[in-house]
Amino acid sequence: MFRVGIVAALKREVRPLVKDWSVREEEVDGRRLRFFEKDNVVLVCGGIGAEAARRAAEAVIAIYAPTVIYSAGFAGALEPTLKVGEVVQPLRVVNAGDGSSANLEQGEGVLVSFGSVASAEQKAKLRVSFGAQAVDMEAAAVGRAAEARGAGFGVVKVISDEFDFSFPSMERFVDSNGQFLERRFAWFTALRPWLWPQVARLARNSNRAALALCDGLRKMIRAISASSDIPSVGAVNRR
């Protein structure tokens, strides 16, 4: 029985955790998904964005029927005090698109799910509008899937970009399945040497964040394995 399901966006975010897990591939709605399994935990990398996360969460629930689903991955800081590598487990998740929110049983602060990679200017607005400390793209969608299927829900995120970090729009580097187009990104940045310092910083931040995230996930898995309590979605408020 798989007790814990984890939905991440990209494998590079969780590679240190799943490098020695067994792998199972399934075709779901015309897409090949890879599920990483170990003991009573299953993890899937569904892709970037809300739609990719929703499909991945629904697939995990349909195939494995875990009792709790976690949204895990990278997040941007909305507060200057949050630094790269800090793990964030919010008490509330807000969907910036429709204003709906889910209150969790465990955690601290607010995470807002936004429709794109937020620029420094957008981060400032999100902080004011939602009183959030961090921003991601997938957690609200995973929470909605968990709620619809009666599964518990939790969030483990790590700061990968700080409050003042900004980069040209990343939308062009994400395909319709939520996969990051690495070659296109490499060509884009190779032809723009003024971006190289930011690219180097982004790579360092991502590596540091991935290690911290996987550390946090290991602790979460151990805690759940030792407990009979399952995090659940609390009151879900819709506008």
Task: Map each language-model feature to its residues.
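Assembly/interface hotspot detector across virion components, adhesins/toxins, and nucleic-acid enzymes
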Residues: W21-E27
